[in-house]
Amino acid sequence: MHLTPDHATRFATATLSHLGREYPYKMDLVLLGPEDAKPPRDHHPIFHGSFDWHSCVHGWWQILRLARRFPDLAVSADTRARADAMLVPEKVAGELAFLDRPYSATFERPYGWAWLLALHKEAELHDAPWAAALEPLALAFAQRFHAFLPKMTYPLRVGTHFNIAFALLLARDWARMRDPALATLIDAAAKAWFADDRDCQAWEPGGDEFLSSALTEAHLMAVVLGEDFTGWFDSFLPRAAQEQPATLFTPATVSDRSDGKIAHLDGLNLSRA
């Protein structure tokens, strides 16, 4: 599919319509007392829309990317104006303060962490102060990856937000030019968890998944292994040329798009494609 200006306008318009919409919003918050029962924007000065924190983060990534690719669209001007107002140091400081709360060490791990790094990387490609404002938040999540990966004994393979291969793909892309030690740590973790995987049975899809566990793992190993990937892949999915396992080549059935979890399967079909 070729991304046209019309597609870009429709995507960006839809996302802009909910980035600042505070309700409904699903908080990831441990209440320490009645004083914590505050509106979402009080806890998250930037990422308080789009139903939840990580959706707001990757919504920002989407509109910035579209604005860079199609800078002359009217909606791109709207995006830049919104970013000028929201991606500022004082609001980033509020997001950082939330990370310092008790019980926040696992907040948005690993999906939101990775998407924040992707957002920062995209912001760096714009002639604007947004990346500099976001940098302290990106560095905070990079440090969380540094602390977390060495103690993560087993990989999370589910096709939902907890999928570690997907998170490492985004984090590695950010780290390669900004934190080589983190990139090295990611490569070592990927090899430790996945290098010996053979004859994947692809027990997917799960009922509410939006990622292919098998294909996301393969994508990560492609960037980690480089020229050694072909041999690994031939052992990991030895019958892929025969479209086996068949489940990987069969679109998922989405029985009820009004169900927010089941509707994830639309995302699975898109991410597989």
Model feature map: region roles:
Residues 209-212, 220, 226-248, 259-268, ...:
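Accessory, usually C-terminal, subdomains that scaffold auxiliary metal cofactors
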Residues 144-217:
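Loop-centered beta-sheet repeat module
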Residues 18-35, 53-55, 61-84:
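Alpha-helical solenoid scaffolds in large eukaryotic transport, assembly, and signaling factors
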Residues 3-5, 40-57, 97-114, 151-164, ...:
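Solvent-exposed loop and edge beta-strand segments that line ligand/cofactor-binding
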Residues 1-48:
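Low-complexity, Ser/Thr/Pro/Gly-enriched N-terminal "stalk/linker" regions
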Residues 57, 66-174:
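Extended ligand-binding groove/face enriched in aromatic
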